[in-house]
């Protein structure tokens, strides 16, 4: 069985946002692999700890220091100082994630969740494309 769906997420503020429930609520009851791909170049996806909200703050702080908007050497800034830095952060974190699912239940670790990493100061709703491969 192969199942695909496009999900348009609501607009999020800059930062790291848990979207596990938005994805899982749209999945069929099956066993296999879920692949999630974001159709944008200035946002990314990751799987990480979902229990302590300070993790999200620390992620944002770290990536803002690693790829600073205060650097004036970027030339791709047509849409603002967060333009090129968003592309770099997206390249570092990646545009897709995968996780196993068993009988409709994601087999993520106890403290794992799927994050939308929004790198822009202002962004519209992001589109993710979800592919499920497996059987019932």
Locations of regions flagged by a protein language model:
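Active-site histidine-anchored catalytic micro-motif
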Residues: 1-136
């Amino acid at each position: 069985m192969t199942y695909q769906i496009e999900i348009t997420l609501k607009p999020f503020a800059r930062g790291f946002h848990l979207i596990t429930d938005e994805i899982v609520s749209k999945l069929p009851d099956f066993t296999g692999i879920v692949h999630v791909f974001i159709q944008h170049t200035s946002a990314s996806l990751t799987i990480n700890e979902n229990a302590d909200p300070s993790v999200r703050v620390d992620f944002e702080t770290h990536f803002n220091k690693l790829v600073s908007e205060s650097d004036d050497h970027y030339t791709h800034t047509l849409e603002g100082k967060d333009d090129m830095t968003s592309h770099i952060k997206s390249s570092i974190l990646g545009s897709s994630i995968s996780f196993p699912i068993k009988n409709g239940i994601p087999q993520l670790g106890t403290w794992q969740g799927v994050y939308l990493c929004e790198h822009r100061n202002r962004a519209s709703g992001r589109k993710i494309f979800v592919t499920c491969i497996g059987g019932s």
